[in-house]
Amino acid sequence: MAYSARLRKAVGAVRTTLSAVELCDVQAPEFAQHGDHAVASDAPLVLVACSGGRDSMALAAVSHIVCTSMGVRCGVVIVDHGLQEGSEQVAGEAANRCRALGLGPVIVRNATVQARGEGLEAAARQARYNELCAAARESGAIAVLLAHTMDDQAETVLIGLLRSRGVDALAGMPQVFTRSGVTFARPLLTLTRAETTGICEDLGVEYWDDPTNGDAVDGELPNDYPLRSRVRHDLLPAIERFAGFNVTRHFAESARLARMDKEYLDQRSDEVMGEAVTTVDWPASSAAVSTDTPRACAAGDTNDSSHGVGLMISVRRIAREPEAIRLRVIAHALSQAGVNASAAQIAAIDRLVVDWHGQGGVSLPRGYSANRKKHVIRVCQDGAHANR
């Protein structure tokens, strides 16, 4: 069949992404030659995360085309969250459509979604990634492909700006990332949702429309719809009407540029963190050390050995860095210790570094606090600062 321009674009995007995760290096030599070749049963495996929607069905179909041409197996993993009536049927129909396209293995997993304060959307996302990672490890997949499009990227930027600030909010979703030891990639970030819809039409692929997207709703979506659906249905179109141009492409390109900045800042802050921060899990040695050097909070400082992770931040080392790097080092170190601090709390710790005048410590979540003594800032759970 003759490929449409959008289908050729998608094929190129998937092939480029597989190159980015070094999958082209595993291509069987015979597949570089013309002719018909069968994919070996023990060939490397790529999985596509598939919901049955237009984006993921388009990605599944295109990935199968590309992987088959490379001698790589292409399967799918379908996660049933069990949050909607009939979700089992939707998952089953998606599985049958993927089998009809020739994908294999077709893996269907049931997720348990438990919202514990972070909201249902976040809990469902965490449960989904847990199942995707488990499926990848159990099947030995080299990578899992996600079907996020340029439209999803624009929505992510707006959601990021609503929920946070700075370059991280603008950076959107990375094309390639690792989670729990599993490589994930997003080949379709350069394609629009209209293009994935067209690809399904080109290939005769049926798909399911999630009713929570609100596509069939006239007027603004009620507040009980997912935030992403409301951004997609209401906010983006309103901004586009106001701006008078394609803001989806504009936001997606802004995300690409911001991500380059973010990756450099992250790399630099990681280098500084390696020199300025010491992290030790409990229990740790309570041997005395100099207060001028970073060290972990010792188990001997508290009666509870379950206090978690202690941090020691060298003031002399971190003070030499620009504010952008200092704040990232502090934020990354706290995150590594399992402390989800606010921007105001991170800034207060930074003042212990650059504006030290004997002020008290900074209270943090989970019973942690940050206190400066001489040239070291200690981040420990309450009680662990005693006698130090």
From Swiss-Prot:
Entry's EC annotation: 6.3.4.19
GO BP annotations, alphabetical order: tRNA modification
Keywords: ATP-binding, Cytoplasm, Ligase, Nucleotide-binding, tRNA processing
SUPFAM superfamilies reported in the protein's UniProt record: Adenine nucleotide alpha hydrolases-like (SSF52402), MesJ substrate recognition domain-like (SSF82829)
Residues involved in ATP binding: 51-56
UniProt GO molecular function: ATP binding; tRNA(Ile)-lysidine synthase activity
Enzyme class: ligase
CDD domains according to UniProt: TilS_N
Subcellular location: Cytoplasm
GO cellular component: cytoplasm
Catalytic activity: cytidine(34) in tRNA(Ile2) + L-lysine + ATP = lysidine(34) in tRNA(Ile2) + AMP + diphosphate + H(+)
Regions crossing the membrane: none
Family assignment from sequence similarity: Belongs to the tRNA(Ile)-lysidine synthase family.
Domain notes: The N-terminal region contains the highly conserved SGGXDS motif, predicted to be a P-loop motif involved in ATP binding.
NCBIfam families to which the protein is assigned, alphabetical: lysidine_TilS_N
Listed name of the protein: tRNA(Ile)-lysidine synthase
Species of provenance: Bifidobacterium longum (strain DJO10A)
